């Protein structure tokens, strides 16, 4: 009985040792780094919207100063007309239809365009301005990427 138990124990230990993955010395591994060219963007369009016009104006001046300090070429600044949302509601729940309330929100929209930037510059710029975005302001970003012509079209 003891021989059976000891043989089971050694069998389990040897199986567990066999299933362990072989250790690899980090010095033996070859570190291969692929050098990829940085992306080029002809324009990065930043659209930001909010309900307070003064906050958007302040954030616009912040964006312009960031572009100036980081020496990023700035394109056009566009202030779009606001979007008005009106929801009529009855004052009381069931009666007196002539007594109504109007709930209204206005969403102000601004667009700023950044011209001729690399991918790393664009990502750093966007990370910085998104960390400093004020409360109640939403942002949408669009990229226009430059790509080389395919080999079938290129002139030799």
UniProtKB/Swiss-Prot annotation:
Disruption phenotype: Induction of dauer formation and larval arrest. Reduced insulin/IGF signaling. Belongs to the universal ribosomal protein uS10 family. It comes from Caenorhabditis elegans. Coiled coil: none annotated. GO terms for cellular component: mitochondrial small ribosomal subunit; mitochondrion. It comes from the Eukaryota. The lineage of its organism: Eukaryota, Metazoa, Ecdysozoa, Nematoda, Chromadorea. This is Small ribosomal subunit protein uS10m. SUPFAM superfamilies: Ribosomal protein S10. Ribosomal protein required for normal mitochondrial function and normal larval development. Thought to have a role in insulin/IGF signaling. It is found in: Mitochondrion. The gene is mrps-10. Keywords: Mitochondrion, Ribonucleoprotein, Ribosomal protein.
């Amino acid at each position: 009985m003891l021989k059976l138990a000891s043989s089971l124990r050694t069998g389990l230990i040897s199986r567990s040792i066999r299933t362990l993955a072989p250790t690899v010395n980090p010095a033996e591994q070859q570190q291969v780094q692929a050098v990829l060219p940085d992306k080029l963007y002809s324009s990065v369009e930043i659209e930001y919207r909010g309900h307070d016009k003064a906050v958007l104006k302040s954030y616009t001046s912040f964006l312009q100063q960031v572009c100036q300090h980081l020496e990023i070429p700035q394109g056009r600044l566009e202030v779009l007309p606001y979007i008005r949302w009106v929801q009529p509601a009855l004052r009381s729940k069931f009666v007196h239809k002539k007594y109504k309330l109007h709930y209204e929100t206005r969403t102000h929209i601004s667009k700023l365009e950044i011209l001729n930037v690399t991918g790393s510059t664009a990502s750093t710029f966007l990370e910085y301005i998104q960390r400093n975005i004020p409360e109640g302001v939403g942002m949408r970003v669009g990229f226009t990427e430059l790509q080389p012509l395919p080999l079938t079209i290129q002139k030799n």
